[in-house]
Every structure is written in structure tokens, then in C-alpha cells.
Amino acid sequence: MPANARSNAVLTTESKVTIRGQTTIPAPVREALKLKPGLDSIHYEILPGGQVFMCRLGDEQEDHTMNAFLRFLDADIQNNPQKTRPFDIQQGKKLVAGMDVNIDDEIGDDE
């Protein structure tokens, strides 16, 4: 454990920083912050002494563009229900056939 670690921590965990400066947020941290992959954002505060405070952005940090898009979709579905079709799972499987996805892999420059 680092010498400057907080003594009142409930749990400690670590992650490695990639050559691109990225890291995977450890599962216990994601669970503690109730992070939803692809939806939530994280706020960082750099404190004196080189420590960093990290927390999940709350609802006050809404994504207004995404919310506007979702309202548009909702209105379109309500106003044009005849255009709404069920998702064809077989077609979806064809679209992703042969794709190998590992959520623990690093994200490459071309992705």
C-alpha cells in the first residue's frame, strides 16, 4: 500500500495505467460508485499532496444533447407507433457474427 494512502479506507484496490494513459476502473470501484458503463461520467478533483478525489457525476451534470435526442425518440415513437418494429435478434446476430469482444482489452487507436 502506498505510504500516502488513506487510513480510513473501506477497501483499497489498484489498476495499471496503459501506455496511452488509460486504466480500467476496478469492479469494486465501479460498484461503489454505481457506475453504468457507457452512461455515467466521473468527476476528478486534484487535492494538495498529489491525491485525487474521484466521484460519479450526479444528475446535475446531465448530458443535454443526449436528453434532447431521447426526447426526440420518445416523441417520434409516440407520434408514429406504426413505424416502430421489433428488433430481429437473428439479424442482430448476423451483424455481429465473428466479432470477438473482450471488455478487458485495451481500446486501440482505430476504435
Swiss-Prot record:
Localization, UniProt: Cytoplasm
All disulfide bonds of the chain are: none
Keywords (alphabetical) are:
Cytoplasm, DNA-binding, Repressor, Toxin-antitoxin system, Transcription, Transcription regulation
- Gene knockout outcome: Deletion of the prlF-yhaV operon has no effect on virulence in mouse infection; the disrupted strain is as virulent as wild-type.
Write down the PROSITE patterns for this protein, in alphabetical order: SPOVT_ABRB
Q: Which GO terms describe its cellular component?
A: cytoplasm
**GO BP field:** regulation of cell growth
Q: Which residues form the SpoVT-AbrB domain?
A: 12-59
Recorded GO MF terms: DNA binding; DNA-binding transcription factor activity; toxin sequestering activity
UniProt subunit comment: Homodimer; forms a complex with YhaV with stoichiometry PrlF(2)-YhaV(4), possibly as a YhaV(2)-PrlF(2)-YhaV(2) complex like the MazFE complex.
Report the protein's function.
Antitoxin component of a type II toxin-antitoxin (TA) system. Labile antitoxin that binds to the YhaV toxin and neutralizes its ribonuclease activity. Also acts as a transcription factor. The YhaV/PrlF complex binds the prlF-yhaV operon, probably negatively regulating its expression.
Q: What is this protein called?
A: Antitoxin PrlF
Lineage runs: Bacteria, Pseudomonadati, Pseudomonadota, Gammaproteobacteria, Enterobacterales
